Amino acid sequence: MGKGDPKKPRGKMSSYAFFVQTCREEHKKKHPDASVNFSEFSKKCSERWKTMSAKEKGKFEDMAKADKARYEREMKTYIPPKGETKKKFKDPNAPKRPPSAFFLFCSEYRPKIKGEHPGLSIGDVAKKLGEMWNNTAADDKQPYEKKAAKLKEKYEKDIAAYRAKGKPDAAKKGVVKAEKSKKKKEEEDDEEDEEDEEEEEEEEDEDEEEDDDDE
């Protein structure tokens, strides 16, 4: 990914993110010359957040609401630079892209890693999962690969039916075209799958973080 547009509004922050920012500022004031062990610091913040009352969290939730309003207001007036591709519209009724074997593996092991290391960031959790997958034997990967292959097969049937709705000839043409360029299509699909999975993982992690905020 290239560098983003510097004029693009800063992303909105969650109540927990504001809390961590405040903790960091407090730590800097108390220990201006001390270096921070980020992993240890994150863990302490996470533990402290979980013991806070709803009233104590209220201040940070108000900050998050105000920041969300600021972000939405700025995005209304933000004009993307020329040449920047807009994200293609996704029909909510379209069949959902199937997860890859790695994504299925991540879904199974992510909660375990988060439970063992509650202070880890989204990026560190993803890195750990990647290392685990790379160190997994081919035989142990097979159940995930078989499940992913079945889901992909089902998706291809579902998407063909979805695209053929209202276009009777499209299904026939689609089958012939798919046979001719199946390899190319699979490569393109795999690339898109990876992008979608990254987005889905981020969304899942953000949702989980927001759930922690609400507790």
From Swiss-Prot:
Gene Ontology molecular-function annotations: 5S rRNA binding; bent DNA binding; bubble DNA binding; C-X-C chemokine binding; calcium-dependent protein kinase regulator activity; crossed form four-way junction DNA binding; cytokine activity; damaged DNA binding
Subcellular location(s) of the protein: Nucleus; Cytoplasm; Secreted; Chromosome
Bilayer topology term: Peripheral membrane protein
Transmembrane intervals: none
Pfam families the record matches: HMG_box, HMG_box_2
Region (Cytokine-stimulating activity), start-end ranges: 89-108
GO biological process assignments: actin cytoskeleton organization; activation of innate immune response; apoptotic cell clearance; autophagy; base-excision repair; cell morphogenesis; cellular response to interleukin-1; cellular response to interleukin-7
Residues covered by region (LPS binding (delipidated)): 3-15
The entry's keywords: Acetylation, Adaptive immunity, ADP-ribosylation, Autophagy, Cell membrane, Chemotaxis, Chromosome, Cytoplasm, Disulfide bond, DNA damage, DNA recombination, DNA repair, DNA-binding, Endosome, Heparin-binding, Immunity, Inflammatory response, Innate immunity, Isopeptide bond, Membrane, Nucleus, Oxidation, Phosphoprotein, Repeat, Secreted
InterPro entries, alphabetized: HMG_box_dom (IPR009071), HMG_box_dom_sf (IPR036910), HMG_boxA_CS (IPR017967), HMGB (IPR050342)
DNA-binding region: 9-79, 95-163
Assembly and oligomerization: Interacts (fully reduced HMGB1) with CXCL12; probably in a 1:2 ratio involving two molecules of CXCL12, each interacting with one HMG box of HMGB1; inhibited by glycyrrhizin. Associates with the TLR4:LY96 receptor complex. Component of the RAG complex composed of core components RAG1 and RAG2, and associated component HMGB1 or HMGB2. Interacts (in cytoplasm upon starvation) with BECN1; inhibits the interaction of BECN1 and BCL2 leading to promotion of autophagy. Interacts with KPNA1; involved in nuclear import. Interacts with AGER. Interacts with PTPRZ1 isoform 3/phosphacan.
Designated name of the protein: High mobility group protein B1
Species: Rattus norvegicus
Gene: Hmgb1
